């Protein structure tokens, strides 16, 4: 169940930070995909000494993640949070997506549409010394452009393209993906 709150990037960063500190209790490697890369990079800025490697799989563009809530997005989030109209809009929007059928998910959905879960990670990336790699699919040219955005902000980021896949290399070419993960996480890197 997802409570009726506004989900923010800070909430996810705090959850991730607490999980690494309190549950894992040591240095860890993180693989993140899509929009969740903002949570990981922001958490790394807070606890860089406890993160060994970060692997970003087809990350969302830095420009998209830099969007902040504005009047229009706040209004949209408020409308989706309304009991009857919001549930209807959520059901129409979620019908063709992979979102859950549970009505409680609409609060997360409204937070995403309202840009509450995004953060400008360019500032987070600039100061990181953690080993970072971006994996993208060769069949999706937009992922290459997004990876280049990351490399332009932090030139030490390694970019790897996996052949025979698009937006989901971890599913579309799992063997090649796992091979790259093994190479990146080996002690020799």
Feature locations, PLM:
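Active-site loop/oxyanion-hole signature of alpha/beta-hydrolase fold enzymes
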Residues: 1-29, 179
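Flexible "cap/lid" loop of the alpha/beta hydrolase fold
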Residues: 5, 41-46, 50-81
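Short, hydrophobic alpha-helix immediately C-terminal to the catalytic nucleophile
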Residues: 17, 40-45, 178
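Conserved alpha/beta-hydrolase fold motif
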Residues: 30-31, 54
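Gly/Ala-rich beta-loop-alpha elbow adjacent to hydrolase catalytic centers
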Residues: 31-40
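Conserved alpha/beta-hydrolase catalytic His-Asp/Glu region
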Residues: 64-130
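Conserved loop-alpha-helix segment in the C-terminal half of the alpha/beta-hydrolase fold
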Residues: 133-165, 171
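Catalytic active-site module of serine/aspartate enzymes centered on a nucleophile-bearing elbow/loop
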Residues: 157-189
């Amino acid at each position: 169940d997802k409570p009726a709150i506004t989900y923010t990037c800070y909430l996810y960063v705090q959850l991730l930070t607490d999980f690494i500190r309190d549950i894992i209790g040591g240095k860890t490697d993180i693989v993140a995909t899509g929009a969740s890369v903002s949570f990981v990079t922001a958490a790394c800025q807070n606890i860089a000494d406890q993160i060994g490697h970060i692997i970003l799989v087809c990350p969302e563009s830095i420009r998209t993640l830099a969007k902040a809530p504005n009047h229009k997005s706040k209004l949209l989030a408020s409308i989706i949070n309304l009991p009857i109209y919001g549930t209807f809009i959520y059901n129409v929007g979620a019908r063709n997506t992979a979102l859950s059928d549970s009505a409680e998910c609409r609060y997360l959905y409204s937070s995403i549409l309202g840009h509450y879960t995004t953060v400008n990670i360019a500032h987070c990336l600039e100061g990181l010394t953690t080993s970072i790699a971006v994996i993208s699919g060769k069949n999706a040219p937009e992922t290459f452009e997004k990876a280049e955005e990351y490399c332009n902000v932090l030139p030490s980021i390694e970019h790897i393209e996996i052949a025979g896949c698009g937006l989901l290399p971890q599913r579309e070419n799992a063997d090649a993906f796992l091979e790259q993960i093994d190479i990146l996480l080996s002690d020799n890197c």
